[in-house]
Amino acid sequence: MENITPLRKQYLDIKKNYPEAIVFFRLGDFYETFEEDARIAARELEIVLTSREMGKGLKVPLAGIPYHALDNYLSRLINRGYKVAICEQVTKPGETKGLVKRQVTRLVTPGTVVEPNLLDSKQNNFLLSLYLTEDSCGLAFADISTSEFGCTQLDINGLEAEINRLNPAEIILPKSQSLNLPLHLKATISKLDGYYFEADVARERLLKHFECQNLSAYGCENLPLAVSAAGALLNYLEETQKSSLKQLERLAAYTISDYMQIDSHTLSNLEIFRSSGGNSLKGSLLGVLDQTKTAMGGRLLRKFLGQPLLRQEDIEKRLSAVDYFFEESLARASLAKALGQIADMERIANRIRQKTILPKELISLKNSLETVSAIHRQFGLMPPPRLAYFLNGLKPLPEMLDIVNEAINDDPPSTLGEGKVIRSGFNPEMDKLCSLAGDARTFLSQMEAREREQTGIKSLKLGYNRVFGYYIEVSNANLADIPQNYIRKQTLVNAERFITPELKEYENLILNAKERLLEMETGLYEQVLNQLGGFYSALLSNAAALASLDVLSAFAEVAVRNGYVRPLFHSENSLVIHRGRHPMVEQGLGYGSFAANDISLSAEDCQIIILTGPNMAGKSTYLKQTALIVLMAQIGSYVPAETAELCLTDRIFSRIGAREDLSAGQSTFMVEMVETASILNTATSRSLLILDEIGRGTSTYDGLAIAQAVVEYIHSQPSLHAKTLFATHYHELVELANYLPRVKNYNIAVSEDRGEVVFLHRIVPGGVDKSYGIHVAKLAGLPGWVIKRAYEVLTELENPAKKEPKIRNCQPQLLLPLTEQTSALAEEIKGLEIESLTPLAALNKLYELKKKAEEQGL
């Protein structure tokens, strides 16, 4: 350590505290990275990797970025899961003896980003904290850019669905715990010492933060696991932010059962937040419904979709507001135009609280406040009864508007220090400093003209740089003409630079004025932010009201465009949808092109629909559209149908499509059975089940047996009796309607004409005994020979007189004749009593048969 430079020692002292982060070390106008951090930065940011001598014979890898480009480079690292420690110079050069003092002012992690240009405006940036036990979990989340802070305690089986709903950027866990994330989630996992999750430690941290004696007011006094997660989250934020967390002034405890429960598989199958094909917004329900104009509205819509309501009163409030905007097209259009001028007031409020807001953002706030006043004049003075509930928080803030108008210039720069942020007339002393700094250009221009005239040197010029300050530059050819009061300051190749006593005196005056100007402008700006901070809660209330109006008017806009209707709710356990449609498929086809269908499900007489018919005919679409209509209704949206009479549904479950979980070592069939078991164990009589091809991942008879048993269980189990749509290729299941009174058969209508098959996409009563699989294979482009041969084999299989189809050679030379050896081997296999073999014995027998086959050259 004796041979390293003081700067190197300072860096190492800082770096040892942040071993898992890339340290951005401020050196003048650059942030530098060293050693392995530099190699990572050079690779990920595509910047030059160089080196710097930082001790006797010690060259250290180095890569740097300009300080003003921090956000751009920071976003690239954060998006790739890195953590970045921002190490700033906290004293000025010359203020202290020796090195400039440096310290980490903030640790930026994926879940603690607050910079607007690094965030998705319509999506929360959640930091999630989890504390797991064998069968339960404490969960807390926070978005420090919006001040949201919540917690819950839930069954471990519901954890994946809640993680999917929140879609966090980062997850905190105790060091002793681990978590398998769904493949589509890109969250960074951060480990925290288990000490911070201990009940007493976490509780004390929350009590200290909220300055209270107990947590009853926050609803989590009796949720110990939730308290552990929330307290640990606060500790993590305190460590990373290095600043006050006052914006987290409320902890909202909630219960999963307060909302419709949708498991992670159903969220994915129904494509609520992202399409299954491209994993994008397009093709998802969110993509159809998102006609919001504000960032706050976009985030609220996501929350609505993840937490459909269970109280009819709350749903009706939303639907009544949608009614108003649906009927009042001029009001809807006017509001949409106004909302388009609203900035992200929620995040602006928090940046004011954190004192990180830029001057230009205050102008965006000013414009938004003016628009709030206009919206209030339109709706708030005499609130339409159907909107009154959602207008409660909408209050003009003229005092806040006055503060910005009086203090901030209309077109301020992005940074402080030039005297152009604070409005002229706001502070007389600052006006004088601005005048002095502004007069500098005039003075220098006049002095340059005077010196040229007095010396006769026409090429003489005055200039300035940060190293040498102000100077007079004279070319070498004119050096003989310089006056005696010129003092040499710098020698160039073709010129000399000089200073005069007059210029030096003015330089000191100007530089002192600029330094004083920066200090004064910074101080005045902070005073303005302190004043604006007093309106924090009122600003958030306005943001919440605008977000609600935005979402509900967007629902109306979508309904008008797509011909949706208001759903009606009743107390009976039934749903009746007339000419329902799939919202995403319809949008892809174009309005009016989708084949609409009816559905009627009732716990009393038609509890289960067995749906048969060919692939590609629309079975899955029919199942999904029913679930989507139910979900849309319970978030307060109109629905794609001619009429919809619904009951409240507590859970939606889906088992659709084949999926492997290779990371857990589970086959497609095992995944299917696990999901089915979960559904049967947790569904209630108020649930909606959509099940597609249960049992298809195993042998025909095993699959048929499982499918039939599942239907019988749903029908007959007293605690279940869930309304169910059951699509299947097992045509034998249509017989269940003969002895299970609440099972009904429906099928996808097909038209056959001279061997040609046309799928009509209509759902009609009755079962079918054909799958039309070969027709689908033909549409897929299988060779003609294969299609022709498949029809022949199908005919033979359907003829009871012929038990096995004859094998016809397509390429005889590729088919090997049976030999005595193969016959003997076949007989040995046939003679095995598989049921009596243990797994180990079966494996040994398999190896034995394989060895015999290899020895016989088979």
Curated annotation (Swiss-Prot):
SMART domains: MUTSac, MUTSd
GO annotation terms (biological process): mismatch repair
PROSITE patterns found in the cross-reference section: DNA_MISMATCH_REPAIR_2
GO molecular function terms listed in the Swiss-Prot or TrEMBL record: ATP binding; ATP-dependent DNA damage sensor activity; damaged DNA binding; mismatched DNA binding
Chain sites annotated for binding ATP: 613-620
Cellular component terms (Gene Ontology): cytosol
Keyword terms of this UniProt record: ATP-binding, DNA damage, DNA repair, DNA-binding, Nucleotide-binding
Keyword DNA damage: yes
Keyword DNA repair tagged: yes
Alphabetized Pfam families for the sequence: MutS_I (PF01624), MutS_II (PF05188), MutS_III (PF05192), MutS_IV (PF05190), MutS_V (PF00488)
InterPro entries xref list: DNA_mismatch_repair_MutS (IPR005748), DNA_mismatch_repair_MutS-lik_N (IPR007695), DNA_mismatch_repair_MutS/MSH (IPR017261), DNA_mismatch_repair_MutS_C (IPR000432), DNA_mismatch_repair_MutS_clamp (IPR007861), DNA_mismatch_repair_MutS_core (IPR007696), DNA_mismatch_repair_MutS_N (IPR016151), DNA_mismatch_repair_MutS_sf (IPR036187)
Source taxon at top rank: Bacteria
Role according to the record: This protein is involved in the repair of mismatches in DNA. It is possible that it carries out the mismatch recognition step. This protein has a weak ATPase activity.
Family in the record: Belongs to the DNA mismatch repair MutS family.
NCBIfam families, alphabetized: mutS1, PRK05399.1
Protein name: DNA mismatch repair protein MutS
